[in-house]
Every structure is written in C-alpha cells, then in structure tokens.
Amino acid sequence: FISGGNRDLIAVVADEMLSWENVETSVAFAVVDGNRIEGSIRSSNAALAVPTLCKELGGQFGGGGGKLGKGAYYYDLGSCADDGEMDDSIKDKFWEFVNERELKRLLKMIKM
C-alpha cells in the first residue's frame, strides 16, 4: 500500500529489477491510495508486447499502455477499496490476495 504521491516508486522498482543479472522482464505493482492497483512492466525481450500486455492488464475497469520494453497499467478496486477502516491484519491479507491474483493474471497473459 502506497500513497499516490509515491506511485513513481513502482516504475523505479521495475527499472531496478530489470538491471539484475539474468532478468529480462520485471513487474512491480502496488495498491495505490487504497483504491486501485498500479503496475509497471519493463522488458528487454523484444518479443514481449509490453504495451499490449499493459492494456490487457488494465482491462475494462482501468487502462494501460506503453512503448517498446516499457509500460504501465492500473485498475480500480471498486467495492474492495480501502475505506480507511482496514486494520493492518486485513491489509496484510488483502495484499496476499492481490499479490497472488496479479501473479496469476500476469502468468496467464504472458503464456498466451
């Protein structure tokens, strides 16, 4: 969970991970302002259509795009958004859910 003022950190983390040895594609995402998922994808693999992947990840409730090797996506959490009453325990469980869901979505779309 990060504030909208710190959302640039998502891209910074994705850029940093791409610089690691043997990493050709990196993905970083976060719950931003408690009401949306924002993600950043970086890839040195020209065969991976990052802008298309980001657009698909944004889906009908968000958006996404990019250019060769770089992209971002977002979508609203709707009724699952943090209304300010989530305690740390619930936030931890919610993050576990979001993390697992995003990883499954990414793997499914990349294997297409």
Residue positions per predicted region:
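Gly/His-enriched, cation/cofactor- and phosphate-binding structural elements
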Residues: 1-112
